[in-house]
Amino acid sequence: MRQPFTLHNFVITIKDMTMFEPLAERLRPKSLDDYIGQKHLVGEGCILRRMIESGHISSFILWGPPGVGKTTLAKIIAVQVNAPFYTLSAVHSGVKEVRDVLLKCKADSGSMFTKHRPILFIDEIHRFNKSQQDSLLGAVEMGTVTLIGATTENPSFEIIRPLLSRAQVYVLQPLSDDDLAELLQRALTKDEILKRRTVKVEETDALFRYSGGDARKMLNILDLLYQSVGESEPIIIRNDIVTERLQQNPAAYDKNGEMHYDIISAFIKSVRGSNPDAAVYWLARMIEGG
């Protein structure tokens, strides 16, 4: 017999559904104290931490490779200063969507219940063309909205000068091996799924090398290791196992999609870091994907 619907059952169902979220999403930091990396920006006494602690957020652009915490940092800032938060993806939004969200921001700015200016976060802002970027200028200049843009491309080439003159650019760096080690430890001890499993960390060289300073990529690899063993088997992190699993399970690659740019970035970082194994792997991913 089907169990009757109750609010209790519904809440449990929603809670269970969160267990199917990707590991990277389950571990997304909610505060600056949980944020890993970018100490030059969010460490004690550094520019972004001082800005957040003061509550006075000015418009800025976060420039860095994929998986280094650009989106997470923007969300943390909005929570810390208790500001209305709107987000747009430049890949899927046009001038109409920009104008619609700016109208909402204007309404929030004039509300007696809003203490701080609304924050508009635009991911992949370099994908906006000139007219789309122009549509932001008035709201930014008048203080209707605080703009936070995220880009993997050099803003000097991709962002129009009038917008750059109104927004400071902050550079985010790939995560170091120490950062990745801290993230790995957090995943194994804090994640509701992984902390119930037996995990044997024997070697981390391959895990960190294939991650290329990208937190999301490392957590996705860890997720793959978890999914590739039975529930009663231990999860073993060792160089040969990591390499074998990645070769057996090439992730989806869409040369016209966002993953295309993530993989190109990983390939370039592997070459620059003199990691031939990782470079060959990411090159093979691109060739196989067309």
Q: How would you name each of these model-derived features?
A:
Residues 50-88, 137-138:
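Walker A/P-loop
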Residues 137-138, 154-166:
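Short regulatory helix/loop adjacent to the ATP-binding pocket of P-loop NTPases
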Residues 89, 168-181:
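Conserved AAA+ ATPase "SRH/arginine-finger" region at the nucleotide-binding site
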Residues 205-210, 216-231, 243, 265-269, ...:
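C-terminal helical "lid" of AAA+/P-loop NTPase domains
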Residues 238-290:
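C-terminal engagement/docking regions of AAA+ P-loop ATPases
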Residues 19-60, 104:
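Pre-Walker A (pre-P-loop) alpha-helix and adjacent loop at the N terminus of AAA/AAA+ ATPase modules
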Residues 166, 179-195, 224-228:
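Conserved AAA+ ATPase "sensor/coupling" helix adjacent to the nucleotide-binding pocket
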Residues 43-45, 85-118:
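Short glycine-rich substrate-engagement loop in P-loop NTPases that contacts/grips substrate
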